[in-house]
UniProtKB/Swiss-Prot annotation:
The gene is lgg-1. Changing R28C: In bp523; abolishes interaction with sqst-1 and impairs the interaction with epg-7, sepa-1 and unc-51. Defective degradation of sepa-1- and sqst-1-containing aggregates in embryos. No defects in lipidation or puncta formation. The record marks R28 as: Required for interaction with sqst-1. This is Protein lgg-1. The record marks G116, G117 as: Cleavage.
Amino acid sequence: MKWAYKEENNFEKRRAEGDKIRRKYPDRIPVIVEKAPKSKLHDLDKKKYLVPSDLTVGQFYFLIRKRIQLRPEDALFFFVNNVIPQTMTTMGQLYQDHHEEDLFLYIAYSDESVYGGEVEKKE
């Protein structure tokens, strides 16, 4: 997926910001959330989030659902490196497993499993 945040900010700028955030808020996770291509959902009002590391993916789903004003019956999928993360995974664990070199975690959201995403399995 092409990330607008990456296109708008070069690697050095993103890395410096990611590093600054992680030093200042070591118990929080810097997350970039963008709509997947072909998704019919609304755009978020902001892309960048700073979330507690003990927040679960399920709780983050709830937060994003509210921000895009989804009805309870509307589907919402997250993708991290083309994988659908489990809802009980903490954002800290997801970050540890999937953050990029710029120290941000990138999450795409969609109203359908557009990537044919696989559910992440716990070992």
